[in-house]
Amino acid sequence: MKRIYLASIVALLASMPGTPGASQAFGNAITVDGDQVFVGEASYEMRSGVVYVFGRDPSGSWIQTQRIEPSSGVPGDRFGIGLAKHENTLLISATRADEGAGAVYVYQNQNGTWIESGRLETTDRSPADSLGTGLAITNDWIMVGTIAQNDRTGAAYAFRREGESWVQHSTIRPADIDEGDTFGSRIALQGNQMLISAPFGSDGEGRVYSFTYSEDSDTWEESGQLQAPGLSEETMFGTDIAIENNVSLVGAPGYFGGTGAGTGAVFVYGLAGDTWQLASLLSPYESTGAIQFGGSIAFDGNAALIGAFSAAQGQGRIFSYTFNRETFEWTAASKISSAETGRAFFGRTVDFSGDIAVGVANGADRGAGAAWVFERTDNNWTSAGRITGDVLGMDAITGDEVSCSTEGEASGFDCESVDLVSFLPLAHMGAERGIVTNDVWGWTDPETGQEIVLVGMTNQTAFVDVTDPGMPTYLGRLPMPETANASTWRDMKVYQDHMYVVSDGAGEHGMQVFDLTRLRGLNGSDPQTFASDAHYDQIASAHNIVINEETGFAYSVGSSGGGQTCGGGLHMINIQDPLAPVFAGCFQDMSTGRQRTGYSHDAQCVVYHGPDTDYQGHEICLGSNETALSIADVTDKSNPLTVAMASYPNVGYSHQGWLSEDHSYFFMGDELDESGGNVTNTRTLIWDLADLDDPILAREYMAETKATDHNLYILGNTMYQSNYKSGLRVLDISDPENPQLVGNFDTVPYGGDDASMTGSWSNYPYFKSGVVVVTSSREGLFVVRYRPRTISE
């Protein structure tokens, strides 16, 4: 049986070459056959996809027995996005193989191990066809869909067995399909009958075409479309289909609601001659709302499992039915749940064989995905275990430093004047499945000189020793508090050998305080899991923590969810006694922030020594406040003062910035101006601070890239920008109003430099050794070195 599911089809359309996603996506496709379960994990950009094979050990537990990888796999090939199996033959799609033309790999079972035996391609293939979207196999035929062909019109290809080989037989393409229909999304095959869906046809109503094989003409002849009443735009009729014993089921997850997210329904047809006639309609029992019932279907002729992945507020459910062939009646048997919580989307895809069923929750493990195995007794399905894949990614790069070549490449990463010293993938830093990096900071041990990287992650802070930068060593981790939840955002800063950690959208997280001297003497042979040394509970969640090391004050910004939020503005904390933080007051500039509460997304607080003599020696905070630059004098914590507010053209989201070392300029990024279309290229705002009361936008520096900017830092006359998909950008700001690009290192070696928010989150350029550490969310930690080239080089 199958399977590729609705989300995979949508993902394929959104991820043609040039616009990739990066999620792990365990369970893109599944198939169950006897006591074996096959699970695809296709959505890798930094490596080829994989397919896992699971079976039972002697105790009855489900374990991984094989991991299948293609012999000619390449990063981002989507290997595993479609599966089909018949007896000892297994088909695995790789829709983006060969520059998007796509291919289907053929495997044979040899003594319990699946061995690659061939590869199917089409004779008229072209880039971006995405061969392998729909997939079906019988003893004599293999049918393969290619939804992206001809501007997503789509097509299907028939391959017929000839001896031990599969030979391309014909191309199947109805005369009335249009651009964007995605014909070939799903294929169901039984004997000489075949159904092929185009779920985006007719503006999303969806179509399902019927074909019959004629031995006389040796062709698959179109025999009409399946009729379904009440379809509307984005019903997506044909999202999933199944055939068994002359009965077919067709899912329409947008039915009773539309927009692809209705209550959903499954249409049941019976075969009369060569015509499929509508017999009944299945709708979910004991559930209402936009649950997308029919997004996935499994049917063996006597029972059906139907996924509704949006049921229960996104937890997901699978509905079980039994079928009486004599009366053509259906009986609701049970509703199957997993033990996942939150928006796990259980039921995104489902399959079963005999008394073994598998349902995928592709939102589990923070989007990495998981699958649940169920066993049936007397029509009741009970959980038999949870299965997941491995933590995969790029290989670690350690040892000798890799110079950026004259061609602008270092170990496969585009670069200029930035050398790759080393790289640690997520799995080498204690990350579990679905965990990604975010912010980064550093600490140098004043006694030993050790340089330690503080790596923010979804649920923890990892410690990596880069004293020997070519051989980075993972020392351990500080998990989030037990009262918190995992979150995209984590931020860390250091004061007097103590680390302070906050997290946004993390519930009752508060601020963790950790004594970094506890890392002394560790060599990584036994990575430690630490507990905080102190915990500050006057805030719950916060977007960033700002520290002025000269004064011993910290500033929680973007606070929310409980405690004293200060409207998201500056929540001031005295940390002069590092383990005993004390609330010191609030500052809010009510003319800033989207809700006009003074919300600050990030800030920098310093003892000012710039050109404005009125404020020299004062403690000044410069806030990136969503809508504007905010400048505050917080010298007197009991009476903080607004100094200035300055807006600028084409605001998207004032995000983060950093002062020049002489405090004459403030360089600021706007996170949403690129993705929102406010500007065409990556923009950096340059503020002239000669008069703090009247900051002047001196220049908008436009890079040649289109990536979204994120965090930037300045050391001397050099600015280090982390700009998501374009990676680390190094600029010479000797002439502050005319920055010059002097180096770069792309941490995301795929998918161009569009404005999507994946890639380099942040960097830390302040180690005395001269290395710069860079986090890239789904890749890991890069240790690089900016090395200006001479003319002779």
Describe each region flagged by the PLM:
Residues 21-793:
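Feature marking well-ordered beta-strand scaffolds used for ligand recognition
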Residues 7-15:
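Bacterial N-terminal signal peptides
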Residues 1-6:
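Bacterial N-terminal signal peptides that target proteins for export
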